[in-house]
Amino acid sequence: LSDGEVNATSRGLEFAPPPASFPVPAIDTSGLDLRSFSSDGVAVILSEAQADLTGRERVSTTRLVRAVTGHDGLQSVARFDPVFDPRFERLVIHGVRVIRNGVARDEGRPEAFEMMRRELNLERAIYDGRVTAHMIIPDLREGDIVDCCYSVTGEQPSLRGAFSWFFILQWSTRTVETICRVIARPDQKMLMRRYAGAPAPRVGDSNGRRIYTWRVRGGDPYLPEPFAPAWSVGFKAVEIGFARSWAQIADLFRDMYEGAISDGSPPTELAAEVEAICARTSDAAARVVEGLRLVQQTLRYHAVAIGEGGFRPRALRTIWSTRYGDCKDASVLLTSVLRQMGLEASCALVNVGQGADLHNFIPSPRAFNHCIVRLRLNGRDYWLDGTRPPQSGDLAHLTQARFGWALPMIPDATLVAIEPPPLTVIREVVERWTFPRDAARAARLDCSTTSRSWRADETRRLVENRDLSALADLYRDQLERDLNSNLREISPMAVEDSASANSVTLRESYEVERAMVPISSDRRRFVSFDDIVRPNLPIIDAGPRREPIALGERRRAMTHREFSFPSTVYFPPWDETIRGPGGLEARVSFAWLDRRRGAHTVSLTVPTEVLAPDQAGAYRTFLERVFNQGAVAFDLRIRNGRLVDAAGGGQTPWGAIASCVVITLLVAARCAGGG
C-alpha cells in the first residue's frame, strides 16, 4: 500500500536537523582505498547509531555513509528505507546527501518519499503495522558517496522504562568505522554483555548525562559458520540495557495476562467444553491433554502485533469468540482451560531459537519472542504450546515445548530451566530384503518406518494434510534416489497411528529392479544406503572451528535390515560400537539368523544438542568412522543367471562384507576436504 500523495508530516514523517547530541561531521575519505573495503560494489565508510534515553521520549538516531565503488552497488545504495511504527513513533529525516567530487546535494525532500505498509511476515499470518518510508535516490553514479541520517522518536508503550539494545561491531563485510553510543542519566544503571571480544565502552559524563561510546575502525569481517546454533554470536557485538531483574520483567506483563485470563466468567460454550472433558475422565493428566487439544483444534493462528498487540494478549472472551489468535492468546486460553480444571497453570515467556542461551541474556522484555504455558502437576513442570497443530500422545508421550529456559509470569519470577526430554528412538526403520534365485528378477523390499515424539507429530501432519497416494509417491521417489533403482509398488502405503504412545508407522512394499549391480560376469553386488548419519548429523568443513556445532534435538535413530538369500552365504558377523565427543555413539552390527538370513543393524545416539568448537576434530573422526563402517556391501555368485551357493557347499567364506569401500572412501574424502 502507498500513500505518496499525502502530506509527509501527517504521515509521521518529519524533516529536521540531527539532535544536538549527534554531531554529523563531514566525511573525509582522503587516504582511504575504498575498493579495499568494497563488497558487491559498495564500501561502508561509517555505520553510526545512538540511543538517547535522557529526554521525555527515547530518540534512536542512525547514520549510514556508503560509497558506490562498482556498478552492482548502484541499486542497493540508491534505496533508503527506514522503518517505524506510526502509532507510537515518529520518523525524522535529517538528510539524504549525495557527495560527488566533494560537492554535496540533499535529496531528502518530503515529495521524494512514499509511505508503504509492508507486512514482511504476512505469509506467517503476522501483522505488525510498521511503515516503511521509501525513496529512491536519483542520479546516482559510480564514485558517489551517499550519507543518510535519521531518527526514530518514541517507543512501544508497553515497554516504557525497559530499554535494551543489541548492536553489532563486526560486520560480514569490511567497514571503515563503526560507532555505537548510549546516552543515559547517571541514575540509569546499565548492564552489559560483550560478545566475541567486543571492546569495552569509553564512558564519560557531560552536562548531567552519562555517555557510553564504542568505536571500531577497520577490522576483519566475520562470516557465521554453518551448523552453528541460532544463539551463537561469533562476531563482535554488545547487548546493553537497564539493570532489571527477571522478576521485574515478568511484572511488566503479568497483569496484562492475568487480566485477559480473568476476563469475567469464562464464556458459556468454553465452560461447557471444559465440563465435558472433566465428565469424560477423572484423570488429571488425561484432562490436560484433552484441554490442550481443545485449544489447538479451536484456535487458528493469526497475529495482529499492531501497537500494544505485539505484547498484550486479547481478552479471553474475544479470543474464544473469534477463534483465532497468536501465541499470547493461545496461552491465555489454555491457561484458563487448565485453571477451570482446578490445575496450576501460568503463561510463560520463551525465546524460539535462542532459548538455550537465555540465562546469559540481560533481563529484558525483548529477550522473548514466544509464549507457552507452564503446568505444575504432581511436583513437576510440563511445558505446553497451544499454537502447535493438534498433538497426539498421552501426557507422558506428548511432545512438550522445549526452548531451553522460560520465564513464568508469576510473582517473584525467575528463569526456569526446561528439562530436556528423555532419549527416544524418534525414527526406526525395519527393512526386509528378499532376493530371488533368478538374478534377472527384481528383489522384494518390505519397509516399515516408525516415527515417535516430535517426528511422529511431523509425520502425522504430512499424512493429514495431503493425499496418501501423493505422500507414497514422495517416499517412493526418495527411496528410488537412495537405491538408484526403479521401484514398483506391490501394495499401497499403509499408516498405523498409535495416538496414546505418539508413534506413527508407515508400511511400504516394493519390487526393486536393480537391487544388485553386476561387478563381473559371475558376480552381483548389493550396497546399502546411509539413512542414519547424513539425515541426522551435520557435515562440517575441515579446519579450525570458532562456533559451536548444532546437532539438533537429543534423539536416537535406528535402521534394521534383514536379508533373505536364495543360496547359502557366509561372512564373519561383527558388532562394533563407535564413540564420539559429547556422548555421540553409533553401533553397527551384522548377525546371522540362519544359513540364508542375516541382519544388519545401525543405531545412532545423539545425547547432546551442541558440541563445543574444540570438539570439531573428534566429531569429524567420529563421522568418518561411521561412514566407513555404517553401511553393508556383499557380493553374490551367479551361474547361468542364477544365484548359487558358495563353493564347498557354503563352508568357504566367499561373501565380501565390508565398509562399502568405494562409497565410503568418497565420503571420507569429501568430509576431509570440507565439501
Regions flagged by a language model, labelled:
Residues 5-668:
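A sensor for short, sequence-defined functional sites
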Residues 668-675:
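Juxtamembrane boundary at the C-terminal end of a transmembrane helix
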